């Protein structure tokens, strides 16, 4: 049986999924997993070159794909993207809010190292100086993509889903939004906590229209940026990180993608839930 035949019989056959932040990494893995289950895809990313890799992978599955460059922090750009998706496919059945800014700058790496040392090395208890050192720009930059982008895309999707009384929205959150697992980046943690709260309030709002909204609070994901960090980290830094995860390893994008497919399907009764695959880092 061909790949296209398998997709035609998949759990998401005939549906249209829109995945943001769909370049290589978690978003691309989610898009590919949904295509393999039969969904047609609208994929977007702010990086056109990164998006082209996902577009090629999706083409090999035999499903239809619309790839669009979009800055999700721009509400007008988001509305235009959904208009193009609707014009092409006539609906959007599934939304995956994956696009996010992650802490990767040199200053953020320094904060990360201080945080890991605090957790794993005996030292005098003192302030890490992280929050007090943040500039207005350091703080505000997180909200445009991680919070506003999720809201803009959710609003646009609901304008399509509510009249049809059907839809699935999956928000990609983080264990950083559940506790202090990203203490080195207060802005990231705060926005991911905001995504969790928005998930619950939106779920309550639209459940009566048969629209199910849930979140995945990811633990560490072995994406290209995370792999790059591991390659530059010292052995001691890597060991300290792995000691924080009971399974002793980082989660693969495909492991998270399979959960997203499940939440996009009709195989569950979940509404407003936050599911956290994290290797036991948070229990």
How does the language model describe each region?
Residues 207, 212, 270-272:
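Short, small/polar-rich loop/turn modules that mediate ligand/substrate recognition or access, typified
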Residues 89, 166, 249-277, 282:
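C-terminal substrate-recognition "lid" of short-chain dehydrogenase/reductases
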Residues 154, 191, 199:
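Active-site helix of classical SDR
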Residues 10-42:
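Canonical Rossmann dinucleotide-binding motif of NAD(H)/NADP(H)-dependent dehydrogenases/reductases
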Residues 174:
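Residue(s) in the substrate-gating loop at a strand-loop-helix junction
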Residues 159, 204-205:
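Alpha-helical segment proximal to the catalytic Tyr-Lys
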Residues 101, 111-152, 166, 170, ...:
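Catalytic Tyr-X3-Lys loop
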Residues 8, 108-115, 208, 220-245:
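A glycine/serine/threonine-rich, flexible loop-to-helix segment
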């Amino acid at each position: 049986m061909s790949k296209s035949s398998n997709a035609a019989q998949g759990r998401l056959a005939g549906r249209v999924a829109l995945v943001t932040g769909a370049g290589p990494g978690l978003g691309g893995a989610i898009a590919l997993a949904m295509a393999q289950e039969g969904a047609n895809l609208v994929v977007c990313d702010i990086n056109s070159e990164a998006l082209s890799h996902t577009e090629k992978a999706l083409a090999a599955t035999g499903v239809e794909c619309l790839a669009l460059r979009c800055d999700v922090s721009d509400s007008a750009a988001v509305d235009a993207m959904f208009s193009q998706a609707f014009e092409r496919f006539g609906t959007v059945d599934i939304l995956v809010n994956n696009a996010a800014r992650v802490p990767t700058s040199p200053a953020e790496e320094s904060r990360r190292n201080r945080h890991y040392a605090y957790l794993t090395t005996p030292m005098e208890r003192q302030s890490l100086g992280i929050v007090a050192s943040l500039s207005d720009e350091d703080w505000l930059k997180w909200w445009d993509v991680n919070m506003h982008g999720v809201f803009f895309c959710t609003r646009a999707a609901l304008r399509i889903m509510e009249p049809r009384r059907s839809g699935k929205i999956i928000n990609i959150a983080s264990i950083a939004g559940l506790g202090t697992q990203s203490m080195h980046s207060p802005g990231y943690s705060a926005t991911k906590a905001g995504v969790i709260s928005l998930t619950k309030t939106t779920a309550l709002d639209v459940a009566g229209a048969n629209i199910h909204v849930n979140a995945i609070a990811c633990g560490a994901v072995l994406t290209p940026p995370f792999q790059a960090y591991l390659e530059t980290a010292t052995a001691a830094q890597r060991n300290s990180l792995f000691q924080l995860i009971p399974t002793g390893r980082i989660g693969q994008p495909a492991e998270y993608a399979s959960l997203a497919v499940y939440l996009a399907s009709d195989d569950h009764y979940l509404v407003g839930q936050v599911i956290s695959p994290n290797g036991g880092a948070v229990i």
